[in-house]
């Protein structure tokens, strides 16, 4: 497992715990957020081999564009962006990052 993959595992696991316990989201909502985050993670690691801490705004924009080009509904695009933004907001709140690439 690469360093980037390890960081994705660590931070996505912490994020899952956060949205499940501290935010108290319903199980279906947690699963939807995690599914969207896995989709984003797959895009980032397959194309760029980046850890979540190395992602910059153009990568997020390219990911959203890929959803559009794949014919994803606008509601799917918005929900996915919301999930990715929530993940990066979590990293900001926990002082892991200073700036979100999903702003």
Segment roles from a protein language model:
Residues 2, 13-28, 34-103:
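N-terminal core-binding DNA-recognition domain of tyrosine recombinases/integrases
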Residues 1-8:
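N-terminal leader/domain-start detector
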């Amino acid at each position: 497992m690469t360093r980037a993959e390890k960081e994705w595992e660590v931070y996505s696991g912490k994020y899952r715990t956060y949205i499940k316990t501290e935010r108290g989201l319903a199980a279906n909502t947690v699963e939807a957020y995690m599914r969207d985050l896995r989709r984003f993670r797959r895009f980032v690691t397959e194309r760029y081999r980046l850890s979540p801490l190395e992602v910059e705004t153009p990568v997020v924009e390219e990911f959203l564009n890929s959803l559009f080009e794949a014919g994803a509904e606008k509601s799917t695009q918005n929900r996915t962006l919301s999930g990715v933004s929530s993940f990066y907001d979590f990293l900001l709140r926990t002082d892991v990052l200073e700036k979100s690439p999903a702003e």
